[in-house]
Amino acid sequence: EQSSVYRQLVARLGEDRVLLAAKPSDAPADQWARASTVVFVCGSTSERSYDSEFDDNGAAKAVTEYGATCGEGVDLSDIRLPWSQDDMLGEVAALTTAPIVSVAVCGRAHVLTDVLERSAVTIWAGYAGQYGPQAVADVLVDGADMSGRLPVTLPAYPAAIPVRYNDRQSAAHVYKDAAEPILRGFGYGAGSLAAVTFSEMHADTQSHPGEVLVQVTAHADDHGAAGAVNLFAHVSGGRRIPRLAMLVDSVYMDLNAGERRDIAFHVPCDRLRDVGDGQVQVTCTLDGDSTHTVTATLPGEY
C-alpha cells in the first residue's frame, strides 16, 4: 500500500483529528479556524505514466498537466513551485491562524521564498523514498531528530540563477533587485547537531603525507546527538580563480549524552590544488560556519 504524510498522521493521531484537503476550498472555513496545526505538503514530481511517449533521446516526455516537473528531459525556465502552490499557500494562510508546517517534496531546487516566509517550520523532504512519509510523521508527531543537510542550493528568486555553493564568484549583489539571490545554501541545517559544540580545531599537513588532517573536538549536550559534520575548504593561490567553497569530507558521528569526542577529517592534497600550483593556503570550515575555521599552508614543490 502506498504511504503518504496524511496516512502516517492518521495512523498516529486518528482519522478524527486529521483532515485532508487537496485545495483550500475542500475544507469549510470553520475547520480551518479550528485547526491547531496545518501541514502543507508541496513540491514537484518526476512521476511518468506507464503509457508515456518517449523522445528521440530515450527520455519519457512529460505530460502538460500535473506531469513530471523534474528528471531527465524536464528542463524548466521557471523554477517556482508548479501548479500555483505559492498562491494556494497564501489562501491557506488567510484562512487560519494556526502555525503552518510546510513539507517540501522536491526532486530539484525550487524557489521556496514564499514558503519560508509563510511557514512556522519548513521541512525539506526531497525524494525520501517509500519511508519518507513515515520519517516526516516521526518528526511532526514523535519529535524525531532531523539530522539531514540541504543537498542543493535554493535560489531566492526564479530568475537569479544559477546559484552554486562552489562557484568561483559570489552571486551576491549581481542583481540590483536581488542583492542576495541565495535563499538557503548547500549543506544548510544543523538538524540534530544543533546542540553540539565544537572546539580545538587544528590542521596538520606533516603527519600524513599527501593529505591534510583536520581535527576538532565535539561535545554533546545532555541529550546526545547523531548526524554528519561536513568540512568545506577554500583555496587561495594557485593558477586559477579558486572556488568559494568545496565540500572535501564528511564524518558521521553518534554521541552519547555529555560525550566529548575527537573527529578527524582526511583531505587528499590532490583535491586542493592542481599540478604546478605551487604554494597554496587552505582555509577549512565546519559546515561553512566561519566561527570554526582553521588555515593550513601546502608547500610549493607539488
Q: Where in this protein do the model-derived segments appear?
A:
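C-terminal non-catalytic regions of proteins with extracellular/luminal or membrane-system context
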Residues: 1-302
